[in-house]
Amino acid sequence: MFISRELKYILLTSVSALFISAVLGLFCGLSFFTILVRSLLQFVFFFVIGLLIEYIFKKYLSNLFSTELSGNMENKPQDDKKSDKDFKENLDFQNKNSLYENSQNISSSGDFIEEVKKYKFETEDVSRGSDKNKKMSFIEDNDPKVVADAIKTLMSKKE
């Protein structure tokens, strides 16, 4: 077909307006002639609006986008080489960091286990009939303020 992509979108919008107008006219119980006239007027209106938008876009905005796109196309081979180099450097840096972090994690795993032992793990049923829904709460053994807040919360839920 010899219709441009923009014109296809304009026609699609106009035909959609025609169809929607006809369907809504039928639901309202209007006469056939009234539905036909209103549908055709809306088709023409949306077609003209679409052509105006395309004209404004091509006249005023196409230069903006064409210069931006042409600049990107010229710099694309350089950007590809630069991005490959950056990717390789980033990959090497991540490998070095992961080795360092693994060595740190091995030495600090004992500290982590001691930290976990400070907390008491308690489970409460959210709903009494279901074992699937359990709520995990972490309470530090030596902090009475946290325990008091938890008790206040539980008492307010019961009321």
From Swiss-Prot:
It is found in: Cell membrane. GO terms for cellular component: plasma membrane. It comes from the Bacteria. Keywords: Cell membrane, Membrane, Transmembrane, Transmembrane helix. It is a multi-pass membrane protein. The chain crosses the membrane at residues 17-37, 40-60. This is Uncharacterized protein BB_0268. It comes from Borreliella burgdorferi (strain ATCC 35210 / DSM 4680 / CIP 102532 / B31) (Borrelia burgdorferi). The lineage of its organism: Bacteria, Pseudomonadati, Spirochaetota, Spirochaetia, Spirochaetales.
